[in-house]
A protein has these predicted regions:
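Juxtamembrane intracellular "pre-TM" segments in multi-pass secondary transporters
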Residues: 1-23
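Loop-to-transmembrane helix entry
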Residues: 49-73, 184
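C-terminal ends and interior cores of transmembrane alpha-helices
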Residues: 101-113
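Intracellular juxtamembrane helix-capping segments at the cytosolic ends
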Residues: 131-145
Length: 209
């Protein structure tokens, strides 16, 4: 009980940046949960025109998603090196830009029916991923003093798992509501990630609160 009380006390006194970055993270991880869940099905629908998971086309779509996931990872690695060179005063602009480009990538998946054009979509998504793995911890750790750093970072991990749980639960409502089309879920993901991009504007970077 004492440990729980200490956690609540730490949360009450957490720097504002902790909460605003957590809000951005919520939207980001929510959106990416839908990408991981619906990519193969969306590609099968749009490119191979099939929803039959046992069909050859669906298997080819799954294989192509494996290629696109590699493209996304490579784009994220390259972009991460670039972001590491960006001065601190441009953190928010870089964070916003990465997420906005990722939202564009999500939206484009809904419209694209050419498998090779999807390379651009997943490159943009990779840029968003670079922002997600680069900026949040940097901004939060800058805002914290050394005291309770480990505990705060442990609590911050909740901003990763909770949105994925919420997204998964909401999909039971959203998916049938949107006609049970997996590609349509990318419009939801894009809209949510765009909310994350604009939420970056709420972040006020501080140092050692």
């Amino acid at each position: 009980n004492q440990e729980k009380a200490n956690w609540f006390e730490l949360l009450k006194t957490a720097p504002k940046a902790f909460w605003t970055v957590t809000l951005v993270q919520f939207f980001c991880w929510f959106a990416f949960q839908y990408m991981w869940t619906y990519s193969a099905g969306a590609i099968a629908e749009n490119v191979w025109q099939t929803t039959d998971a046992s069909s050859v086309g669906y298997q080819e779509a799954g294989n192509w998603y494996g290629v696109l996931a590699a493209v996304q990872s490579i784009a994220a690695v390259i972009c991460s090196f670039i972001l590491a060179k960006v001065p601190n005063k441009y953190h928010k602009a870089g964070y916003f830009g990465c997420l906005a480009l990722g939202a564009l990538g999500f939206f484009s998946v809904f419209f694209i029916s050419n498998q090779y054009a999807l390379v651009l979509s997943y490159t943009l998504i990779g840029i968003a991923w670079a922002g997600i793995i680069t900026y949040p911890l940097t901004i939060v750790t800058n805002a914290l003093s050394g005291k309770h750093m480990g505990t705060y970072l442990g609590l911050f991990n909740g901003s990763i798992c909770m949105p994925q749980i919420v997204a998964s639960l909401l999909s039971f409502i959203l998916f049938p509501m949107l006609g049970s089309h997996q590609a349509t879920m990318f419009l939801v993901a894009g809209a949510v990630l765009l909310l994350g991009a604009f939420s970056v504007c709420l972040i006020k970077e501080t140092h050692g609160e």
